[in-house]
């Protein structure tokens, strides 16, 4: 997947502080927080992930880690959805 960096024109894209995925549905973004050094964080609006700390400090490794974390979350959601769909519907007052 393509990522857009906010690196200054003429500088390597890895020098940026924000790497936003070119996917509108998931909205994966890897970024640094001002005042937190070289630590990278991820956001994924579709999964409700905001400022999750990543273990990698290089852009490519952090993006790979963020994609892996998004996949893990999607797998958990898929299992939960399958559980809901395979269970009998029950309606109660309380």
Across the structure, where does each feature detected by a protein language model lie?
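Negatively charged, low-complexity tracts enriched in Asp/Glu with abundant Ser/Thr
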Residues: 1-23, 87-88
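Short aromatic-glycine-(Arg/Gly/Cys) micro-motifs in beta-strand/loop hairpins
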Residues: 26-51
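Mixed-charge, Lys/Arg-enriched low-complexity segments
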Residues: 44-94
